[in-house]
A protein has these predicted regions:
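Residues in well-ordered beta-strands of folded domains
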Residues: 7, 77, 148, 203, ...
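Short hydrophobic alpha-helical membrane-anchoring segments
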Residues: 11-19
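Sec-dependent N-terminal signal peptides
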Residues: 3-12
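Anionic group-transfer/hydrolysis microenvironments
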Residues: 15, 38, 217
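Structural motif marking the loop-to-transmembrane transition
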Residues: 1-4, 100
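Active-site-adjacent loops and short helices of periplasmic peptidoglycan-processing enzymes
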Residues: 18-168, 172-175
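Domain-terminus/edge residues, biased toward the C-terminal soluble/receptor-binding domains
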Residues: 158-328
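N-terminal secretory signal sequences
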Residues: 2, 20-23, 39-41, 71-72, ...
Length: 328
């Protein structure tokens, strides 16, 4: 069989002799994970499959169901049940009319439990919204997650149970939705002469932060999921029961952005490699330490004589640093 090989030398915008290697942060929490948002690679973590109440970061499930419902411009009339939700609120009033889209902004920026109630009531009119959440979890293979309500409140000691791995996987999935990305990256949002400031402090103070969701209940303690992107390298971090969570997230991002880079081979969807058109079901690439690379590092794409892509390789001189067969 004839093999066609295309190779591309990489051009790096960092200096190999000056790579920063700040120490890995000291992390005190029940569970955490650092995940590549594109490839779902796990770069670091502790107790990533530990099941815990996750509080309001589970609202990202409520949000993605709202955004995928096809009903984002539907107007919802606020009912008494919505206004009586405890905890975080966007202070909806009985009889208010507000769109699903605006409710989702209130849900993600201000963690409004009243917004969660109104969204779930409108989308799943028979009060089976938690069932819909669990069906979506099953679809996404979130095998350690159980959702009991749209808000994340520990109602009757039954909150939303998940893991740092499942939440990072869910958030990475949500980032594929452009509207979700736009909402979580919004620092301030105004509606009816009311301004909502995003509770995600990292978005306001860390230049590479692209979004996130905060959470807290007495049972779950502090929970946080965030994302940050530098050049083509986007990470998702989840911490559960972490007191100094915003600083920990920032320190982890700085560590990985300083010491690692992402090398992309294929994006999910249509790719153009020279004169070849390649369709990929997944993002394909790798996260690698910068000190393993130099100016003799290059990418190889191996094709058969029918122009089917067989393998992606990363090489340094003649050494194969990484390879991925497309039938894997």
């Amino acid at each position: 069989m004839k093999i066609i090989i295309l190779f591309f030398f990489l051009i790096f915008n960092f200096h190999f002799v000056n790579i920063q290697s700040n120490a890995f942060p000291d992390i005190n929490c029940s569970s955490y994970i650092v995940m590549n948002a594109k490839t779902k690679e796990i770069l670091a973590g502790k107790n990533i499959n530990l099941k815990r109440s996750v509080a309001s970061i589970s609202k990202i499930m409520t949000a993605i169901l709202a955004l995928e419902s096809g009903e984002i411009f539907d107007m919802v009339t606020i009912e008494d049940k919505d206004t009586k939700m405890e905890g975080s609120s966007i202070y909806l009033k009985l009889g208010d009319k507000i769109s699903i889209l605006d409710l989702t902004y209130g849900l993600l920026l201000r963690s409004g439990n009243d917004a969660a109630s109104a969204i779930s009531r409108h989308i799943e009119k028979n009060d089976n919204f938690a069932l819909k959440m669990n069906e979506k979890a099953q679809e996404l293979n979130l095998s350690d997650s159980t959702f009991n309500n749209p808000s994340g409140l520990d109602i009757d000691d039954e909150g939303n149970i998940s893991t740092s791995f499942d939440i990072a996987s869910l958030y990475s999935y949500c980032l594929e939705n452009n509207l979700f990305k736009a909402i979580v990256s919004t620092k301030n949002y105004s509606i009816n002469n009311v301004s909502w400031r995003n509770k995600n402090k990292l978005l306001h103070r860390y230049q590479y932060c692209t979004g996130g969701k905060t959470g807290y209940t007495y049972k779950a303690k502090r929970t946080l999921v965030t994302s940050a992107k530098k050049e083509d390298f986007e990470l998702v971090i989840v911490t559960l029961n972490c007191r100094n969570d915003f600083q920990i997230h920032e320190d982890l991002y700085e560590y990985f952005f300083n010491n690692y880079c992402y090398i992309n081979f294929l994006d999910k969807g249509i790719n153009y490699i020279n004169d070849k058109i390649i369709k990929s079901e997944h993002n394909i690439g790798l996260t690698i330490e910068k000190n393993k690379l130099d100016d003799n590092t290059y990418k190889i794409y191996r094709f058969d004589n029918n122009n089917n892509l067989l393998e992606c390789q990363l090489r340094k001189n003649n050494e194969i640093l990484w390879s991925r067969f497309l039938n894997e």
